[in-house]
């Protein structure tokens, strides 16, 4: 499981941005974490040059930016007073940068944040279900990013969907999914796609007495076991259920243990991203997915398929990026 002790909330002070405040507070309350806010003031290169050419009395670096930063910090502190409990309240940071998404991702990495919680869209509402800044943060951040909207209640979620092609990289999302599941007492669904040309799990040992779905299910459980062992996640075991496609994780914590229901959904669809969209819309409160898959599950989330999934999902998404060493070794 992945520990959550520091949460970063980027804000542009829009009504949409406020959606992230309640979610961050709820997660912090359940996990015993602190919540930091960040606002990025974009550099105004053209305006800076214009003032210099005009010999204007105002100076951006010495006057305009410091005033704007002071006002932004005040607004963040006011928002934190309204939405964040004293025991989970962290710091309010305002930075000046040419690229807000890069600044957010770098700040989260440099300050050891465990999770970024942000609204799907900010001031610049787009026809896409996730705005350009949010998508750029998802793409650039090495820290998991949880994008929320008004459709998800901050008080709880019950169904977590984890798309997987059975590869270790796609299972990278599991520790964060397990953390959410234990915090909210939610269930986890592993969603696997059989595209037209088949499944990457078709090559595993097959039992001719079982259906394609049952063989894929058994192969998926086997690979999941291998992933837990390879990653040294010794406190999580799979308890196989009596009913097909329904099992449990047993999560041990010192002398106690908790159980998380897991369900495996296997569907034959035309494309992975369409299958994910449709299933998530009907069955999931949040989709937790790795930012890279393998084989036929497509360039999940580091290519065109990723962008289609991230932009078009109407369900909140939490993205997790694998370690760079694992990506390069793929």
Can you name each region flagged by the protein language model?
Residues 117-120, 144-150, 317-321:
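Short beta-strand elements of ligand-binding domains
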Residues 118-136, 268-274, 289-312, 326-327:
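Glycine-rich, Arg-bearing micro-motifs that act as flexible, cationic patches
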Residues 132-152:
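Short, structured interface segments
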Residues 1-3, 16, 42-45, 70, ...:
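Structural beta-alpha unit
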Residues 40, 121, 150-152, 193, ...:
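Short, ordered loop/turn segments at secondary-structure junctions
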Residues 1-59, 87, 159-217, 225, ...:
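Small/aliphatic-rich secondary-structure junction motif
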Residues 62-78, 214-225:
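Short, surface-exposed alpha-helical segments at coil->helix boundaries
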